[in-house]
């Protein structure tokens, strides 16, 4: 497949490298000239069978592409879409943005009034972020075993487009997870965005030199994502504010209950029941995978699979069957 990757940070650069390693014809572009230079040098040093090209512009990158992967921050997405549609690109488009409703709302504007400036769009989000960033952090194995959400909107998403992307991401080692944009945003608020905020709040307390000197496993594991660039976290959480607010409120309410337990006559006894639900949930995560089974794909069946915590591991060449896994 001929693929254009627009934006070559950690995720975009990893997509670029992974697709090239899988034998696809890939061309990348980044607005930063230094990033383009670094990526061009890395391409020359890659094995001949896993090399990619670097384009001088968005238009040049998508000129011959069948698929365009947009891997830019949410605030830059509209600029890229304008350039792509202005070029007359008619291939499939996906993105890797960590929030999906704002992206879906933006894409809808390109489809209003029957203009069909976009031929096909399937939102995406590989759950493979790290605290490192930039093309130098890109890794072609980044997606091995990761959940890659692919947006599936009844009445909007073409099933064939979704299956084509599911086939591609599973080829890269990911698990394709079907979900609507709203379902995705609620879920990532819980398991990604609010944990970033909590980690930053805890990490701030280690400004004390003695506390920093004593930091070990609990501090390291509980604050790892606080090392993520603040502008990236702000874009993630602020872009998903509607979903983040109720989850953050629930966490604050829970911590307030823990604070009250510390004032009890017996704080140890008071804290114990507060700790049990979190311990139980974390001890059973991740869920044990069930047996992979063939499934006839349809939008309702795929969404039911995603809501049950399941995923797709492969797609047949003729797109008539997928291999589905549900948690036990």
Summary of predicted features, one role per range:
Residues 1-55, 60:
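NAD(P)+-binding Rossmann beta1-loop-alpha1 motif at the extreme N-terminus of oxidoreductases
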Residues 24, 89, 174:
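Short phosphate-binding/catalytic loops that engage adenosine nucleotides
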Residues 142-227:
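Internal alpha-helical scaffold of NAD(P)-dependent oxidoreductase catalytic cores
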Residues 214-286:
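Interdomain hinge/lid region at the active-site interface
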Residues 255, 262-263, 267-328:
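NAD(P)-dependent dehydrogenase/reductase Rossmann-like domain
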């Amino acid at each position: 497949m001929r693929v254009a990757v627009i934006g070559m940070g950690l995720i975009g650069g990893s997509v670029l490298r992974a697709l090239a390693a899988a034998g696809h014809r890939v061309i990348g572009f980044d607005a930063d000239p230094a990033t383009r230079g670094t990526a061009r040098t890395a391409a020359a040093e890659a094995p001949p069978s896993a090399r990619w090209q670097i384009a001088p512009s968005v238009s040049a990158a998508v000129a011959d592409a069948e698929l365009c992967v947009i891997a830019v921050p949410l605030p830059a997405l509209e600029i890229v879409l304008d350039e792509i549609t202005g070029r007359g690109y008619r291939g499939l488009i996906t993105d890797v943005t960590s929030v999906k409703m704002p992206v879906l709302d933006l894409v809808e504007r390109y489809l209003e009034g029957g203009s069909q400036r976009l031929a096909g769009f399937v939102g995406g989000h590989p759950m493979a972020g790290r605290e490192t960033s930039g093309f130098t952090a890109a890794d072609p194995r980044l997606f091995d075993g990761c959940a890659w959400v692919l947006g599936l909107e009844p009445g909007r998403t073409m099933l064939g487009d979704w299956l084509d992307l599911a086939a591609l991401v599973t080829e890269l080692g990911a698990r394709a997870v079907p979900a609507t944009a709203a379902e995705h945003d609620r879920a990532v608020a819980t398991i990604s965005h609010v944990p970033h905020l909590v980690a930053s709040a805890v990490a701030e307390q280690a400004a004390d030199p003695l506390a920093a000197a004593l930091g070990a496993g609990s501090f390291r594991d509980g604050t790892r994502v606080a090392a993520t660039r603040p502008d990236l976290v702000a874009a993630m959480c602020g872009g998903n504010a509607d979903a983040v607010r109720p989850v953050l409120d629930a966490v604050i309410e829970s911590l307030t209950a823990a604070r009250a337990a510390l004032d009890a006559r017996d704080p140890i006894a008071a804290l114990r029941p507060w700790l049990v639900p979190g311990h139980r949930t974390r001890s059973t995560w991740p869920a044990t995978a069930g047996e992979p089974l063939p499934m006839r794909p349809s939008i309702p069946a795929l969404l039911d699979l995603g809501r049950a915590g399941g995923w797709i591991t492969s797609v047949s060449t003729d797109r008539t069957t997928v291999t589905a896994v549900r948690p036990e």
